């Protein structure tokens, strides 16, 4: 059975950014994820959200969001998987370090990766990617 957009998964930075911009589809998707099994993000996405803050108010909002979110770390196995993918796909597909780390976090945790940028990940063997909206 193919995973649906309500299956537990890791949420990519692009969807989180949409939610901070109050995009209704992103907010509805995050609400469904939270209700179903909670929201999971990579520490890389948490850092990207933090780096995107323009002021103390936005930073506080991001911190409050992350307090209610499971933030998955970069483990040794995540690092090794990401490094292998970088070696295999950087030159041919332009795979970037943050994308490799986020994808490897999802892969190693056995989770679907939810992203609007499915083309960034389509070459990665064994990774399940869904565009949720």
Enumerate the language-model features and the residues they cover.
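Short, well-structured N-terminal submotif of metal-dependent ribonuclease cores
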Residues: 1-41, 51-63
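Active-site neighborhoods of divalent-metal-dependent phosphate/nucleic-acid chemistry enzymes
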Residues: 2-7, 69-116
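Generic structural signal for small/hydrophobic residues in well-ordered secondary structure
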Residues: 12-13, 49, 82, 106, ...
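Alpha-helix capping/helix-boundary segments
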Residues: 15-16, 45, 78, 101-102, ...
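Nucleotide phosphate-binding site architecture
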Residues: 16-17, 47-50, 122, 130
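A general structural signal for well-ordered alpha-helical segments in protein cores
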Residues: 26-27, 46, 59-62, 79-82, ...
């Amino acid at each position: 059975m193919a995973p649906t957009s309500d299956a537990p998964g890791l949420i990519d930075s692009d969807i989180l950014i949409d939610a901070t911009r109050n995009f209704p589809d992103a907010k509805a998707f995050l609400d469904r994820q939270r209700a179903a099994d909670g929201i999971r993000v990579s520490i890389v996405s948490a850092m990207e959200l933090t780096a995107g803050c323009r002021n103390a108010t936005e930073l506080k909002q991001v911190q409050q969001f992350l307090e209610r979110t499971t933030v998955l770390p970069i483990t040794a196995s995540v690092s090794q998987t990401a490094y292998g993918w970088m070696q295999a796909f950087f030159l041919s597909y332009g795979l970037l370090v943050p994308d490799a780390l986020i994808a490897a976090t999802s892969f190693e945790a056995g989770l679907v990766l939810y992203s609007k940028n499915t083309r960034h990940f389509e070459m990665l063997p064994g990774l399940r990617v869904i565009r949720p909206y």
